[in-house]
């Protein structure tokens, strides 16, 4: 039996990017039950990609009973709905066989992953204070994408002088802004910028110098989308809600490596149930941004554990 329902998890603080703010995560939870075993998974439908919670639930409920992971890849397009079911099927298989998902997927035992902790878009002074509070982290990911970005990133560096930095423009720049800011960001020790231009403007990146590595987020979805990014991007951000689950995320990671692209593994604002499979993909990634539940006022039972610099693999009591 396959079920799907919406659940809402409030955040402690608003999360702001160049496109707006969020105060909660409204996720779709899929459950697959067979032969006395139950697996579950989570997806976060994203309006930026034309997804809604209601449409995702309807699509999941329309799936045939007994669907396999292989059949699922053909039955549903990549996205949050398929992610929820794909991860539920992995969890179901692990529980049915009494073996962990990493073993079923042919992976090595997972280790803690160093992650970037995200600083929400705010005033320069507020971002300086947030950076100072998080100066003990290994990596900070700074949300940008407005005309006033230089004072913000300067303030972040003042607040956290030694931390590694990456920035995310969330489609908010033009080629001229990237070209103007890149030398200053490099001076401040920024390692990489995510999605500086809008999805669909990728070709412009092939026409300019990229002294600061550029990561595709909104422009990178599944493995099939990656060859078209060559010559435009240097890094791809793989999120299970974009790839449509763990199955395709592992394929996309392998394809990125084959193409010579660096890999970042990211997430939406979601719970520990979304992080559990993502940690498996993040093994050996160049960057990981898996702090989705870190500021949740409420999370799943048996949540993933964070320390100052890492996310730890999930307990089987949660998933996998």
Give the positions of each predicted feature.
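Short helix/strand-capping turn motifs
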Residues: 286-289
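Active-site cofactor/co-catalyst pockets and adjacent glycine-rich loops in catalytic enzymes
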Residues: 293
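Catalytic core of soluble alpha/beta enzymes
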Residues: 142, 147-283, 297-309
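N-terminal capping/lid subdomain adjacent to the active-site entrance of alpha/beta enzymes
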Residues: 1-165, 172-179, 183-187, 300-320
């Amino acid at each position: 039996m396959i079920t799907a329902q919406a659940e809402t998890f409030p955040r402690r603080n608003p999360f702001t990017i160049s496109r707006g703010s969020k105060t909660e995560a409204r996720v779709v939870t899929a459950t697959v039950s067979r032969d006395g075993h139950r697996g579950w998974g989570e997806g976060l439908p994203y309006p930026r990609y034309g997804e809604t919670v209601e449409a995702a639930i309807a699509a999941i409920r329309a799936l045939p009973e007994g669907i396999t992971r292989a059949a699922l890849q053909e039955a549903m397009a990549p996205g949050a709905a398929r992610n929820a079911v794909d991860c539920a099927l992995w969890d179901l298989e692990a529980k049915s066989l009494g073996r962990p998902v990493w073993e079923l997927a042919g992976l090595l035992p997972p280790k803690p992953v160093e992650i970037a902790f995200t600083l929400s878009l705010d005033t320069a002074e507020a971002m300086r204070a947030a950076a100072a509070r998080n100066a003990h982290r290994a990596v900070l990911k700074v949300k940008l994408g407005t005309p006033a970005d230089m004072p913000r990133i300067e303030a972040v560096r003042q607040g956290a002088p030694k931390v590694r930095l990456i920035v995310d423009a969330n489609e908010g720049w033009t080629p001229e802004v990237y070209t103007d800011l890149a030398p200053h960001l490099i001076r401040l020790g920024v390692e990489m910028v995510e999605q500086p231009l809008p999805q669909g403007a990728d070709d412009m990146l092939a026409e300019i110098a990229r002294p600061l590595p550029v990561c595709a987020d909104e422009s990178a979805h599944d493995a099939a989308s990656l060859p078209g990014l060559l010559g435009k991007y240097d890094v791809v951000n793989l999120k299970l809600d974009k790839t449509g689950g763990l199955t395709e995320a592992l394929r996309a990671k392998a394809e990125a490596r084959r193409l010579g692209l660096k890999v970042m593994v990211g997430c939406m604002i979601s719970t520990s149930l979304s992080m559990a499979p993502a940690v498996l993909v993040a093994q050996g990634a160049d960057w990981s941004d898996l702090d989705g539940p870190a500021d949740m006022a409420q999370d799943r039972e048996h949540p993933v554990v964070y320390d100052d610099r890492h996310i730890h693999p999930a307990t089987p009591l949660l998933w996998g």
